[in-house]
Amino acid sequence: MLIYYIISLIIVGIDQLTKYLTVQNIPLHETLEVIPSVLSFTYHQNTGAAWSILEGQMIFFYIVTLIVVGVIIYYMHTQGKNDKFFAFSLSLILGGAIGNFIDRLFLQYVVDMIRVEFIDFPIFNVADMSLTVGVALMLIYLFFDEWKEYRQKKVGTK
């Protein structure tokens, strides 16, 4: 179980390091091109969630994040100890949630910097990537878990 908390901690560390480097090296709203027309870093301060929804609702984000962290820890110890894939997806979600929570708590906004140039997509950060991949893996897990359960019931009814 400890390994999954270590994974979360590594994600938080990488997230906070990239945010620190962004703030120290890129002026607010300025862009540093990495791969022209593909990838750049743009320092952005987001007071909301994805696409800046719920902008300025910090108390709401504090409460939701604390609930999510509590639920993740609960499931990590109840379900995660029996399934590594499930625990890994939870560790990604936990790391991402804590990474953005730290920003909201101390800065009142989230530092975003990664910009994909070839599509119209919001600027994001390492915590956002971790959350997204964790949720995607969780959905895959839930789909296959339900499928397995369905197949077992189907075989059991014959």
Residue positions per predicted region:
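Alpha-helical transmembrane bundles and membrane-interface segments of multipass inner-membrane proteins
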Residues: 1-158
